Curated annotation (Swiss-Prot):
Keywords: Nucleotidyltransferase, Transferase. GO terms for molecular function: holo-citrate lyase synthase activity. It catalyses: apo-[citrate lyase ACP] + 2'-(5''-triphospho-alpha-D-ribosyl)-3'-dephospho-CoA = holo-[citrate lyase ACP] + diphosphate. Its EC number is 2.7.7.61. GO terms for biological process: prosthetic group biosynthetic process. It comes from the Bacteria. Transfers 2-(5''-triphosphoribosyl)-3'-dephosphocoenzyme-A on a serine residue to the apo-acyl carrier protein (gamma chain) of the citrate lyase to yield holo-acyl carrier protein. HAMAP family: CitX (MF_00398). It is an enzyme of class 2 (transferase). Belongs to the CitX family. This is Apo-citrate lyase phosphoribosyl-dephospho-CoA transferase. The gene is citX. InterPro entries: CitX (IPR005551). NCBIfam families: citrate_citX, PRK01392.1.
Length: 183
């Protein structure tokens, strides 16, 4: 289920392409839920800027896939189907996991908080009915910026940081994980 970094497109995605890609992802999610009436993990990489598919985002994605699969194994949860693909919005993973949706969401939140790359992952859990379990459902604060303690959404809207600084921070986190062989 890993993606080969050397095949990254480096395509600068436009806002209309990004919106279409998100609609397509939502349609894929609903199709998966019809095939497998168990919770669905929909996994993407948080990638600031217009280039969503790069060697860096694919390597970050691959670490996330490994961590999600290890989590399912550790918890004794069966992965019924899994797939990886690349859309205009970057690498995407989907895993149908036979587990209580609430437990799955709590475990993925913990993974996002405990893994050195967790801040770069966007892990959604959808119930078999198609409802997305949100961080807000668990009274968790919004995601923090990669560079400061502000909300990531506030910094993104205000364009507080240079894109190059954000991308350099992403790559530094990835290189640290690779150097330590963290999965």
């Amino acid at each position: 289920m890993h993606l080969l970094p050397e095949f990254a497109s480096h395509h600068a995605v436009s806002i209309p392409e990004l919106l279409v890609s998100r609609d397509e992802r939502q349609a894929r999610q609903h199709a998966w839920l019809k095939r497998h009436p168990v919770p669905l993990v929909s996994f993407t990489v948080v990638a600031p800027g217009p280039i969503k598919d790069s060697e860096v985002t694919r390597r970050i994605f691959n670490h996330g896939v490994t961590a999600l699969r290890a989590l399912a194994t550790k918890q004794g949860w069966q992965i019924q189907e899994q797939a990886a693909l690349v859309s205009a919005s970057g690498p995407e993973g989907m895993l149908s996991i036979a587990a209580p949706a609430r437990d799955l969401k709590l475990a993925t939140i913990e993974l996002e908080h405990s893994h050195p790359l967790g801040r770069l992952w966007d892990i959604d859990v959808l119930t078999p009915e198609g409802d997305i379990l949100s961080r807000r459902d668990y009274s968790l604060p919004p995601r923090r910026c990669l560079l400061c303690e502000q909300s990531a959404a506030v910094c993104a809207r205000g364009k507080t940081h240079q894109l190059t600084d954000l991308l350099n921070r992403m790559e530094a986190l990835l290189n640290d994980v690779d150097a330590c062989n963290v999965n």
